[in-house]
Amino acid sequence: MDIKKIKFARTVYAERQLAKLCPNNKINEIGKLLSNPDFIKQTDSLFQVFDIMHRAYEMRAKFDDPDNFEPVEFSKEMFECLTDTELEEMTNLAFENFEKDGRTEIETQKKKEEVSKETNESI
């Protein structure tokens, strides 16, 4: 199985769906969802996160380039066939995208301003 073909995105759709899974519908509490000591519940939640974020990526890719869009299947059966190494790799990839796509433009602009200010101060 080539897990590198499974892509993830954090879109408004993904955030809404993920929030529904989280305690009190708060997406910033996703860590609580995924730290459940019950392994069955924890892996079920992880699959749901992967499924939602992959679906979000697919929706976005289809919207961005409908003529060249080629869907990539991701199913519960595929998830259950992952090795521990693949699961760890996929988890890292999903949460890298979760963090990256969750940043706001305001935060990005603020960083640019800080860098610009630091550069000007050092001159």
PLM region spans:
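A contiguous, well-structured "functional interface" segment within a domain
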Residues: 1, 49, 111
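Short N-terminal mixed-charge amphipathic segments
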Residues: 1-46, 123
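Charged interaction scaffolds used for protein-protein
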Residues: 24-38, 62-123
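Alpha-helix C-capping/helix-to-loop hinge sites
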Residues: 37, 53-60
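Short, hydrophobic/amphipathic alpha-helical patches that form generic packing surfaces
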Residues: 44-56, 92-96
